[in-house]
Amino acid sequence: MSKRATIFLDIDGVLHPNSVGELEYGPNGPVVVGQGVCSLQTKLAERVSGKAVDIAIHSTWIYMFDLKRLQDEYLRELSAAAKIYLTNRRIESRSLRITDYMRRRRLTLADVLILDDAPKEFASAPELLSRLVVCDPTRGIDDPAVLQQIDEFVS
């Protein structure tokens, strides 16, 4: 497996404000409904399109949806712009899922950027804090400072 720059992506509070979306259960299992769900993926897709950057989802959404369903139902634009992977759902901690993914792909800290709205999730892995871009959960990546850090990482 080739070593590529990787953006680790949370979804709630990053690709949409955390006030957006409701979890419902339908005949095919869980579904997140509501206007604006994953609406900020366009901003990220524009920035990674044509770049040698992968996306690795570390969000709790990996417990509800497999990769195909995430791509088909929630992340179409982002999927068209970058290769998307999931972190290991058998690992409970977000930070441990990220360090496991990095270890398996031999990624260094310089190879990664982490987008998340919950910095406390990384208390057990202080080595990741330098790569963490904390999003305001009411804005997600719709913040000039966050977008600038993404732009700097992918350039």
Predicted feature descriptions by range:
Residues L9, H58-M64, L115-D117:
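Short His-Asn-centered micro-motif
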Residues S2-G50:
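Active-site neighborhood of HAD-like aspartate-dependent phosphohydrolases
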Residues K68-S155:
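C-terminal cap/substrate-recognition subdomain and adjoining C-terminal extension
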Residues Q35, Y63-F65, R90-E92:
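Acidic-and-aromatic substrate-binding clefts and catalytic sites of carbohydrate-active enzymes
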